[in-house]
Amino acid sequence: MRMSFYQFLMTQRNPNSADEVQQFANNAFFDTTFPKHSEDFDEISHYLEENADYLPSMTIFDEAWQRYIDAMN
């Protein structure tokens, strides 16, 4: 079974890191309304654009998404 993007993102958490994707993961962990079961780029992207004040740039999401795709293949 393929893991959701959120499940993958949680593997990227590191509270002591300056890596932007890891910071995104750290912040997403505290986002109680994040679409935790989604594997859909558009759904997650739309959610982040509308709700994630903690994400300074969608480029960070794009990088995290690429890591997710690479890990799933």
Swiss-Prot record:
Highest taxon, organism lineage: Bacteria
InterPro entries, sorted: UPF0346, YozE_SAM-like, YozE_SAM-like_sf
Coiled coil residues, start to end: none
Gene3D superfamilies with a match to the protein in the record: YozE SAM-like (1.10.150.260)
Family according to the record: Belongs to the UPF0346 family.
NCBIfam families recorded: PRK13672.1 (NF010193)
Protein name (database record): UPF0346 protein Lreu_0775
